[in-house]
């Protein structure tokens, strides 16, 4: 529902019914904060979703800090405990972090992986799998002691996304690949799906604006590989709509 922005909250029941009429069946939430979704009580929001004949499958949530440190480690853990408990009441299938923490060096990235594993344990204890959603800068590269992640095929170093995959526990952390942002990170989503078939379990299907208009997204082959991997869940997202066009 991130795609719908303020348009949805102008008339939540009506907006949800329109989503159902379009043929969608499942929702991925966004806008969670202190027991509310976009300012609406979570259970009240769930009732409106149920009444529209839809199901809440996933939710995007971010801890209140972007830079992870030993000093705020416990704060992050407490956030996940509260967030997981709240979402367990909704019966979500996935709880996913869409915001990239600060990862400017190999060491900083390794610490983020530790925190991801801790979050995974907490969320798993509530009966929900914990996942991570990428943008383009996860495909940047870092080095030991570096102070900046750099994007580019000729840049030397370790790919942050690869480090995330290699240094998180598969039983605690899965990945939701945003195929558009992977392409913007100069990557082929299909190659990642082939390399990590058991780690990438959900997809974000997205284009520069309207799906299929840019000509840059190889959706047919992406879906072919995703289905071969056994991926069952994906979410359509729209961003950057031209003026005069509704989300």
Label each region the model flagged:
Residues 4-10, 29-41, 63-77, 101-110, ...:
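Acidic-and-aromatic substrate-binding clefts and catalytic sites of carbohydrate-active enzymes
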Residues 37-59, 107-108, 112, 116-119, ...:
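Short acidic, glycine/proline-enriched helix-loop-strand junctions
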Residues 28, 58-60, 96, 131, ...:
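Conserved beta-strand positions in the central sheet of alpha/beta enzyme cores
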Residues 1-93:
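N-terminal pre-domain/capping segments
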Residues 41-50, 83-88, 117-121, 188-195, ...:
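Short amphipathic alpha-helices and their capping/turn segments at secondary-structure boundaries
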């Amino acid at each position: 529902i991130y795609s719908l922005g303020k348009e949805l909250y102008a008339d939540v029941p009506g907006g949800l019914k329109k989503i159902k009429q379009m043929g969608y069946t499942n929702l991925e939430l966004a806008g969670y904060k202190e027991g509310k979704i976009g300012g609406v009580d979570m259970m009240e929001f769930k009732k409106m979703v149920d009444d529209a004949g839809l199901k809440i499958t996933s939710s995007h949530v971010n801890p209140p800090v972007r830079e992870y440190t030993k000093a705020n480690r416990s704060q992050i853990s407490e956030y996940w405990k509260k967030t997981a408990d709240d979402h367990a009441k909704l019966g979500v299938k996935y709880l996913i972090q869409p915001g990239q923490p600060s990862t400017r060096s190999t060491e900083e990235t390794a610490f983020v992986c530790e925190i991801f594993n801790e979050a995974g344990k907490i969320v798993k204890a509530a009966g929900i799998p914990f996942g991570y959603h990428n943008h383009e800068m996860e495909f940047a590269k870092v080095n030991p002691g570096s102070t900046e992640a750099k994007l580019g095929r000729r840049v030397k170093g370790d790919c942050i996304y690869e480090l995330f995959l290699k240094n998180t526990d598969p039983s605690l952390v899965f990945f939701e690949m945003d195929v558009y942002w992977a392409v913007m990170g100069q990557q082929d989503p299909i190659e990642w799906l082939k390399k990590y078939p058991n780690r990438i379990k959900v997809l974000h299907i997205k284009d520069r604006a309207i799906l299929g208009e840019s000509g840059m997204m190889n959706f047919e082959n992406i879906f072919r590989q995703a289905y071969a991997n056994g991926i069952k869940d994906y979410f359509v997202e729209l961003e950057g709509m031209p003026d005069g066009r509704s989300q």
